[in-house]
């Protein structure tokens, strides 16, 4: 499922650009040759959700995010079976919330997030920075693991939320200085869950990856590929 929108980042006072991710992905993906390592016959392309207007201001962007939440949840409910795995490409991190609402309705759910930000901002208004705040508040998650957080991107209020016993986390700086390994942390988290586990890969966790929170410091693309191959 492609989602070409930028209202989530705009409602969070971020930069535009997330609306272009699916177009960049699809140019390559839809020209992929069949090869035995990946069962392409098991993949279905449902379509693309496309933003057709820009919000006039932040309040309108917030309202549009709420409308998008409902649209994505309806789309998943009507067209994706409980035993299928939806893969969302593009858009802001706000789209994690309707995914979690859909998945948790079909059974217990935990999520692992590779992210420089915890996405635990206050729930006073919807935007790309508070999907997991809403998910925990609504009781959608059994556990939440977020790895590769950047110290400078997570304030005292967010760090206080990280003390929640449902949350497992580690800062990117800990990986730079200590004996910790991302792969070990994520596989350890997943192995302790006895139910469905969702995966979010935030593009700003990858060094030099174009995103609304671009950073030259982060994981390499090959490290993320290795992680996903191991999880698969």
Residue ranges and their predicted role:
Residues 2-232:
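Conserved alpha-helical scaffold segments that buttress catalytic/binding sites
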């Amino acid at each position: 499922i492609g989602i070409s929108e930028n209202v989530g980042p705009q409602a969070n006072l971020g930069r535009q650009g997330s609306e272009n991710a699916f177009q960049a992905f699809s140019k390559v993906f839809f020209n992929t040759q069949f090869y035995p390592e990946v069962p392409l016959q098991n993949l279905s392309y449902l379509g693309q959700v496309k933003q057709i207007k820009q919000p006039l201001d932040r309040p309108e962007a917030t309202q549009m995010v709420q409308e998008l939440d409902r649209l994505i949840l309806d789309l998943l409910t009507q067209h994706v079976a409980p035993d299928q795995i939806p893969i969302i490409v593009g858009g802001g991190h706000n789209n994690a919330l309707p995914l979690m609402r859909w998945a948790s309705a079909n059974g217990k759910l935990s999520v692992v997030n590779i992210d420089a930000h915890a996405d635990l901002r206050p729930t006073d208004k919807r935007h790309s920075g508070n999907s997991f705040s809403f998910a925990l508040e609504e009781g959608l998650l059994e556990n939440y693991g977020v790895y590769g957080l950047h110290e400078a991107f997570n304030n005292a209020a967010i760090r206080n939320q990280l003390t929640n016993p449902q949350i497992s986390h580690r800062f990117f700086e800990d990986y730079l200085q200590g004996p910790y390994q991302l792969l070990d942390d994520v596989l350890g988290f997943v192995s302790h869950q006895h139910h469905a586990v969702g995966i979010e890969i935030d593009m700003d966790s990858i060094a030099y990856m174009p995103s609304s929170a671009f950073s030259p410091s982060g994981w390499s693309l090959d490290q993320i590929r290795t992680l996903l191959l191991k999880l698969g």
